[in-house]
Amino acid sequence: MRKLLIYLRDYKKECVLAPLFKLLEASFELIVPLVMAAIIDKGIAVSDRPYIFRMGGVLVLLALIGLTCSITAQFFAAKAAVGFSTKLRYALFSHIESLSFSEMDTIGTSTLITRMTSDINQVQSGVNMVLRLFLRSPFIVFGAMVMAFTVNVKAALVFVVTIPLLSVVVFSVMAASIPLFKKVQNGLDQVLGHTRENLEGARVIRAFNKEEQEQKEFYESNGFLTNMQMIVGRISTLMNPLTYIIINCAILAVIWIGGKQVYGGIITQGEVVALVNYMSQILVELVKLANLIVNINKSIACGNRIQEVFEIQSSIESGSKEADAAVEKDAPAVEFSHVSMSYAGSAEESLTDIDFTVKKGQTIGIIGGTGSGKSSVVNLIPRFYDVSKGCVRVDGRDVKDYDLVTLRDKIGVVMQKAVLFQGTIEENLRWGNPDATEEELWKAIEVAQATDVVEGKEGKLSYMVEQGGRNLSGGQKQRLTIARAVVKDPDILILDDSASALDFATDAKLRSALRNLQGNKTIFIVSQRTSSIQFADQIIVMDDGQAVGIGTHEQLLENCEIYREIYESQFKKEDLQKQKGGAF
């Protein structure tokens, strides 16, 4: 948590002025009981109305000055707290963006969202409260006790006994509740994760009639969060009754001692009222101080969770730009040299001894069953993950030697899940190349077989895509993501099962258009359809993380049993579909 305070360094002035103005407010507040005592003893007791009005004016003046100081302090505290959280949120977002896929998979999306939102909001609240109360509350507690001694020493001894008792109660409650705060936040992570998963998979859940099962699982995770919050709440609710019992007993003691001394002529009625007011001030400020300490500990727990993310360093370090300039022009476009790879947290290898070479301009097909390692292979080329053994080279250089920006500028990737962002179609396509002309955009749209999609929308390129592309079908999203990658005009184009939602005729037209792209482009097509890859220069057959066959379509039909089984299981069905679609 302490390391996060560097984001307050631009607000040093506010961090000084906020508590300073709160101290000024507290100072004027400590004077109020003495003024009240004077009004009672010197005004009301002798019916001196002018004196009462004068001192009443002093009270109003003290209230106005205190109000001004309070508003000013709140302004500076809010400015510092909001500025702090803004800088912290940006720094955390930037750090998350720098993490590799491996770290992102380990942490989890819902956890990161919680830490970006709920945790940072809690830390912001903690900073605000600290700046306003960390000096004010202790100052009033001790100031009120000192002022009580100036009024009457014997009655003030009650304060000496009361304050330690109150402190024991406050800190006992705090010590019991603090360890539970982290469990509450972890429970919130679970609830948010479950909610996110259900919202994203709502159609699947309903298709399989799993609403009741998901509701039961949500009830369990929500129940855990509720139980933790109830336990914390029960412990926290002990504070007010216990503190009020102690303070009311103390007030009774002050009144009893003060009453005896009033009858003895030692102190006045106004001074007894002042002592009671000081005791009330102590009560209020100790409760505030307790809430502050609880809030601080919540903020520390949340701050530590945020710091945990900052301490996670990306396992992928960018290479030097000097290495980029040393690219071998005649080298293979992509080379896998005995590559093995494991995902974080997995003891088993996801890829084992993958070895192949791809020349520039070649089209490579990758096929295999679900979970065979197809996507894992292509994810190593733009270095989304790192190899555990072997080496991946692009243009003759190890991908680890490349500057990441330079490496990924060479590569266009279309993921399995078509992701579009809120904005116009044009804005989404320009992710590939911000400087692309409109002609280049339409050319990419044509290659991706998305011309009818764009022209059919109101506004065409200006058509507004909703968040996540909710207002587009699966096939439309896939074609637009392919167009976005084509706009980039990369040296290497990777299509990771990105035509799965397209019919056979459209898929065939897409492959034909890709073959006719300008430039010596190297294309990787990951697919479960043999028809999508059978005309590739090389086909890599994946099974259980291993390349069990590499060759052309004809060679693999003769030499690779797995490929032959895949082909024979599909070709009759595909022939029927192609006849219906008129694809070939």
Feature names for model-found ranges:
Residues 326-584:
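ABC-type nucleotide-binding domain
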Residues 10, 14-27, 62, 128-184, ...:
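Transmembrane helices of ABC transporter permease
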Residues 10-13, 98-102, 118-127, 131, ...:
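An intracellular "coupling" helix at the cytosolic face of ABC transporter transmembrane type-1 domains
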